[in-house]
């Protein structure tokens, strides 16, 4: 249970997440780092789901990035294949949001690798709130990617009981894909 949101805008891609870890109905920790830099700081990734499961997936994904020389899409597809077919990995319950300078992806345990519309990702229990907020800000303001992520996480944290106001945010310079990103 968490909120991870990613926005790509005006030459930047940002992934941010809250820091709350819960066990049942109890907050166990409030400062978990659910967003990390991978592959020599060229990839940023965030997770929603079980913490131990997510750390396992981070390690596996980083290995795939090494094998595929940092090619994000290939590494994501290979991780998703393994995740879906390996008996032990299938039990892992988490979602990953990953991005590099040119691509943003969601990787699921069902074997899905999804490139979202408008390079907006929001996953976890607070994902729908963060996505709604980020989309409104993207469509109606000139705010930068980082500010949109900060505001979307704040709104999700105000609404979702499994999301707090401790945020970890990572940012990369992005390659432009459309006029909005120039």
From Swiss-Prot:
Listed CDD domains: protease_HslV
Keyword S-adenosyl-L-methionine recorded: no
Highest taxon in the source lineage: Bacteria
Residues of the active site: 2
Coiled-coil residue windows: none
GO MF annotations, alphabetized: metal ion binding; threonine-type endopeptidase activity
GO CC field: HslUV protease complex; proteasome core complex
UniProt keyword Transport present: no
Annotated localization: Cytoplasm
EC supergroup of this enzyme: hydrolase
UniProtKB keywords: Allosteric enzyme, Cytoplasm, Hydrolase, Metal-binding, Protease, Sodium, Stress response, Threonine protease
Activity control: Allosterically activated by HslU binding.
Catalytic activity, reaction form: ATP-dependent cleavage of peptide bonds with broad specificity
Family from the record: Belongs to the peptidase T1B family. HslV subfamily.
Stated role: Protease subunit of a proteasome-like degradation complex believed to be a general protein degrading machinery.
Subunit structure: A double ring-shaped homohexamer of HslV is capped on each side by a ring-shaped HslU homohexamer. The assembly of the HslU/HslV complex is dependent on binding of ATP.
Protein name: ATP-dependent protease subunit HslV
Natural source organism: Sodalis glossinidius (strain morsitans)
Protein encoded by which gene: hslV
């Amino acid at each position: 249970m968490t909120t991870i949101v990613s926005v790509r805008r005006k030459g930047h891609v940002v992934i941010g997440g809250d820091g709350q870890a819960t066990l049942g109905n109890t907050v166990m920790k409030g400062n978990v780092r659910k967003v990390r830099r991978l592959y020599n700081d060229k990839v940023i990734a965030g997770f929603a789901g079980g913490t131990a499961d997510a750390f396992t997936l981070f390690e596996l994904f980083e290995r795939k990035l090494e094998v595929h020389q940092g090619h994000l899409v290939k590494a994501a597809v290979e991780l998703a294949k393994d995740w879906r077919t390996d008996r032990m990995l299938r039990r892992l319950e988490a979602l990953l949001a990953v991005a590099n300078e040119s691509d943003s992806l969601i990787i699921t345990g069902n074997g899905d690798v999804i490139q979202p519309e408008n390079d907006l990702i929001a996953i976890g229990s607070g994902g729908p709130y963060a996505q709604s907020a980020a989309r409104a800000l993207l469509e109606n303001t000139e705010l930068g990617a980082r500010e949109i992520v900060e505001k979307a996480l704040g709104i999700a944290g105000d609404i979702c009981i499994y999301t707090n106001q401790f945020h970890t945010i990572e940012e990369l310079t992005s390659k432009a894909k459309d006029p909005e990103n120039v």
